[in-house]
Swiss-Prot record:
Family statement drawn from the similarity comment of this UniProt entry: Belongs to the FIS1 family.
Listed transmembrane segments: 121-141
Coiled-coil region: none
Protein name (database record): FIS1-related protein fis-1
Phenotype seen when the gene is deleted: Mitochondrial connectivity appears normal, also normal in a fis-2 mutant background. Modest but consistent increase in the number and size of clusters of protein lgg-1, perhaps representing abnormal autophagosomes, in a fis-2 mutant background. RNAi-mediated knockdown inhibits removal of ultraviolet C radiation-induced mitochondrial DNA damage.
Record InterPro entries: Fis1, Fis1_cytosol, Fis1_TPR_C, Fis1_TPR_N, TPR-like_helical_dom_sf
Record's comment describing the protein's domains: The C-terminus is required for mitochondrial or peroxisomal localization, while the N-terminus is necessary for mitochondrial or peroxisomal fission.
Length: 143
């Protein structure tokens, strides 16, 4: 799997509806949160974040906590909260330095940040060039 494709997964609406229909249990809440993180709807991703944060704050189960932190980082990355995502992954990697999933996700998030940052600079540069061209054209028209 291409590292960046980690960020591009999505959940079908049927999966979300099925997860919502399950009885309320810790395991089902985690499953629901995970499918919500894969939603195309930002509100559902945010709902997934809320569920995961509740589970993490209430957990004595380190495995559940690890999974939840991983999906929290993924959710924040999907919402373009890259700094929050990187901070969560760094915290996870401090406790589990050999966690390859977290390492790959951090690499994908950093790559996406870099590309979008460069893209943002390119768009800004293009906008400056257009405005500069309009100013020059306006000055030339005046003469």
């Amino acid at each position: 799997m291409e590292p960046e494709s980690i960020l591009d997964f999505h959940t079908e609406q049927e999966e979300i509806l099925a997860a919502r229909a399950r009885s309320v249990s810790r395991e089902n809440q985690i499953s629901l949160a995970i499918v919500l993180v894969g939603s195309e709807d930002r509100r559902e991703i945010k709902e997934g974040i809320e569920i995961l944060e509740d589970v993490v704050s209430d957990t004595a189960h380190s495995e559940d906590s690890r999974v939840c932190v991983h999906y929290l980082a993924l959710a924040h990355a999907r919402l373009k909260n890259y700094d929050k995502s990187i901070n969560l992954l760094n915290a996870l990697l401090r406790t589990e330095p050999s966690n390859m999933q977290a390492t790959e996700l951090r690499r994908a998030v950093e790559k996406k940040m870099k590309r979008e940052g460069l893209l943002g600079l390119g768009l800004l540069g293009g906008a400056v060039a257009v405005v500069g061209g309009l100013v020059i054209a306006g000055l030339a028209f005046r003469k």
